[in-house]
């Protein structure tokens, strides 16, 4: 049977001094999701380095053309993004504008 769970990105990190605080916020949010209903991934953004953090310490680079990544030989596309970045690019509209351009629904509010 095909996996029908939605792929959720918790986008964290950022370029401010609050990068590590944002990572902790993302971990907290991650803990609230029902993993039987959703595939939840933490996406760490710092400068031009955007990657998914896996629980085993491995990472996978985000393709910024469509906000996807490769895992186990398959391309994973996100259905929704939660922006938990403190400071830029999460609180200045940059991430929101990017998600608008690629037509990916996100939270919090728009640009």
Predicted regions and their residues:
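ATP-binding N-terminal substructure of ATP-dependent carboxylate-amine bond-forming enzymes
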Residues: 1-111
